[in-house]
């Protein structure tokens, strides 16, 4: 019975994960960039999958720009330095603009909006917004990591007579540090993906490089969307 309960709990986590629109979008993103890596920009089945998945993902993002607009007008966390607040708000504004413009890209790619030249221009503007938002996100994570490192050193001094790795507060800060470091890596790699999509350095950042970086960041995003596990309850025999 305990095995059945454990299986049910695991399946429940899978259902919870797949019910999240953001998680499904990131799975599709992994397929998109995986196909781009395989195709390397050459015509064929992989490129067709890349293009169709790219278009399908835009439906997931309709009106998603409202999320970052809400973040833009929300008050910052108490005690956050002004520099990090401004970078965070810039990230929200740029990402919201990217997602807003992406709706017009979808209209153009589906043929509803007929002006191809203007659609291509909107694509580039939106990608520049995404690249800039990724730069801001990376700088925010760097700043937060610096603040976190400082607070961890202070806490370590306070706990010098005990094992700091057994302290819940210190373990929580270590977990936050790992999460922010992963977010920093993702933001840096997203900048490379944006450069590849904009073809700013086509000789160095080829479609295959873009696909590889995009696939890795997609896996990171999928991991970040995983639901937290409830602590295991020991059952007496």
Curated annotation (Swiss-Prot):
Source taxon at top rank: Eukaryota
InterPro entries from the UniProt entry: PEX11
Tissue and organ expression note: Expressed in seedlings, leaf sheaths, flag leaf, panicles and spikelets.
Transmembrane segments: 93-113, 205-223
GO MF annotations in UniProt: identical protein binding
Sequence ranges on the Lumenal membrane side: 114-204
Name of protein: Peroxisomal membrane protein 11-1
Organism: Oryza sativa subsp. japonica (Rice)
Encoding gene, per UniProt annotation: PEX11-1
């Amino acid at each position: 019975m305990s095995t059945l309960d454990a299986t049910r709990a695991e399946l429940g986590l899978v259902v919870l994960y797949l019910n999240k629109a953001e998680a499904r979008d990131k799975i599709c993103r992994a397929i998109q960039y995986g196909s781009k890596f395989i195709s390397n920009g050459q015509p064929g089945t992989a490129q067709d999958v890349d293009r169709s998945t790219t278009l399908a993902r835009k439906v997931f993002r309709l009106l998603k720009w409202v999320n970052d607009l809400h973040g833009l007008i929300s008050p910052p966390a108490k005690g956050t330095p002004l520099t990090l607040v401004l970078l965070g708000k810039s990230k929200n504004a740029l990402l919201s603009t990217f997602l807003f413009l992406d709706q017009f890209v979808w209209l153009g790619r589906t043929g509803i909006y007929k002006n191809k030249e203007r659609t291509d221009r909107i694509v580039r503007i939106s990608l520049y917004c995404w690249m800039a938002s990724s730069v801001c996100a990376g700088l925010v994570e760097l700043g937060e990591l610096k603040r976190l490192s400082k607070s961890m050193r202070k806490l370590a001094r306070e706990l010098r007579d005990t094992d700091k790795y057994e302290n819940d507060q210190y373990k929580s800060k270590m977990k936050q540090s790992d999460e922010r470091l992963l977010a920093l890596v993702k933001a840096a790699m997203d900048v490379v993906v944006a450069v590849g999509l904009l073809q700013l350095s086509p000789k160095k950042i080829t479609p295959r490089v873009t696909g590889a970086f995009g696939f890795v960041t997609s896996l990171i995003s999928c991991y970040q969307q995983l639901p937290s596990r409830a602590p295991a309850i020991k059952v007496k025999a």
